[in-house]
């Protein structure tokens, strides 16, 4: 399932409106051809944008959730879907509250648009539970991180953070000392809580 919302300006404030909707064609409640949740979300994203008359290149907000396969510590649906669609959104939301996640995302997207955090928000949700009822639960398709990152020594989010930091250093000339300031400031604020796990301050 997918929605597309886009802001509309009036004389008083920014208002978000739903301008495109799409759903995956089903037969007897099942998809017509075998596919992954990622493929399903990409298809409805394409159709919702077509319904709205908006090119994929204009999407700068992405909100997504769903049953993506075997969960893993590096599972980042918003990043995975963004890369698959070839977009670079400036606002993302991967809040997953189950089958009604897309309903909450409509409210989140409207708030983001009205606050100026994005112009075009794409909302997707995907689950192939009924279509895959014959499969063993443990045999569900793995998310991409399990195939392309975990085998190479990145089983936890820490590796992903390190790659993001390295890229920031490459793009902007950021130094390790500058990034360390984030840890110093975070610890300082956390230590204000007497129940914090780490109370000792750190220094560069």
Question: What spans do the regions from the language model cover?
Answer:
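Condensing-enzyme catalytic core mediating Claisen C-C bond formation in acyl metabolism
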Residues: 3-38, 47, 181-182
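Glycine/charged-rich beta-loop-alpha catalytic/anionic-binding loops adjacent to active sites
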Residues: 26, 85-95, 142-151
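Glycine-/small-residue-rich "gating" segment that lines the acyl/pantetheine channel
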Residues: 134-168
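Active-site-proximal alpha-helical scaffold in enzymes
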Residues: 96-127, 158-193
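Conserved beta-ketoacyl condensing-enzyme motif
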Residues: 35-107, 112-138
């Amino acid at each position: 399932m997918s929605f597309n919302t886009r802001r509309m300006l009036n004389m008083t404030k920014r208002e978000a409106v739903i301008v495109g909707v799409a759903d995956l064609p089903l037969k007897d409640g099942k998809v017509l051809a075998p596919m992954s949740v990622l493929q399903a979300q990409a298809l409805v994203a394409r159709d919702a944008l077509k319904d709205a008359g908006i090119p994929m290149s204009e999407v700068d907000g992405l909100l997504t959730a769903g049953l993506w396969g075997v969960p893993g510590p590096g599972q980042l649906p918003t990043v995975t879907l963004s890369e698959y669609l070839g977009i670079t959104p400036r606002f993302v939301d991967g809040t997953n509250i189950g089958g009604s996640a897309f309903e909450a995302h409509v409210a989140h997207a409207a708030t983001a648009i009205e606050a100026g955090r994005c112009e075009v928000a794409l909302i997707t949700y995907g689950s192939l539970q009924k279509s895959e009822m014959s499969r063993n639960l443990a045999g569900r398709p793995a998310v991409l991180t399990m195939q392309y990152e975990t085998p190479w020594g990145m089983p936890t989010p820490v590796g992903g953070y390190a790659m993001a930091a390295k890229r920031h250093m490459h793009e902007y000339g950021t130094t390790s000392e500058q990034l360390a300031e984030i840890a110093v400031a975070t610890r300082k604020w956390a230590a204000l809580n007497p129940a914090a796990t780490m109370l000792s301050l750190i220094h560069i």
